Amino acid sequence: VHASGATAVLFDGAPTMPNTDRLFDIVDSEKISLLGVSAKYIDSVRKAGIEPRASHNLQSLHTICSTGSPLSPEGFDWVYTSVKQDVHLSSISGGTDLCACFVGGDPTRPIYRGEIQGPMLGMASDAVDDKSNSLIDQPGVAGELVCRQPFPSTPLGFWNDGRAGAPDPMQPGPKYLSAYFERIPGMWAQGDFASWTQHHGIVIHGRSDTTLNPGGVRIGTAEITRVVEQHPGVLESLVFGQE
């Protein structure tokens, strides 16, 4: 951020205190151009019924980044109807461990509700089946989100993994290999359940290690929570498998 000449604004505290639209107050007061929030935050303020476009200026705001969990189609709708019509909503997916995103926003391409726009620069991102075959020509068929090639911020390894001290990239430790390369040999597997769309966008269905598999049909937990949380009596939900 600083290398590009931008100024980072960090907020410490509850984003809904003392009022639900607190972050939009900060957007106006600090002239924020890019606002990074969680998908859960967008869903929470959507359910609270706030309308920032009616109560705030938001002239400086041109990008909203959403992360942490899949952003629902209803979340996309709320941003464009209740926040700002000409904002770039960038739903992103990556990891703290790699300090990067595998898939995310592209300001040169159209945005479709419920979809991440595509792979990020420098990332050979793909969704593959159990045999490592790409699913890009099978829109809607879900598989493992992977990166087929090394990327600039690939972690070198884990501390004290197989040897004392710093990791040796020439001799990766067993925990490191198990965490990222065991599921799909030769590819970095991030642990997300994803599918391509007909627009060559990506839909994240949830964590692949929490994917339910009744009768051989794989179902992402996010698909269930989205339906459950549409009920007015449900504020939040958690889905897990039970044998």
Regions found by a protein language model. Give the residues of each.
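AMP-binding/adenylate-forming catalytic core of the ANL superfamily
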Residues: 28, 35, 151, 156, ...
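Gly/Ser/Thr-rich phosphate-binding loop
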Residues: 3-6, 32-37, 46-113, 124
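Short coil-to-beta-strand transition motifs
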Residues: 115-122, 188
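Conserved ATP/PPi-binding loop(s) of AMP-dependent carboxylate-activating enzymes
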Residues: 120, 133-181, 219
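Conserved AMP-binding/adenylation subdomain of ANL enzymes
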Residues: 1-34, 48
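Alpha-helix/helix-capping structural signal
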Residues: 40-43, 153
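Short, P/G- and charge-enriched loop/turn segments at secondary-structure junctions
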Residues: 109-115, 178-183
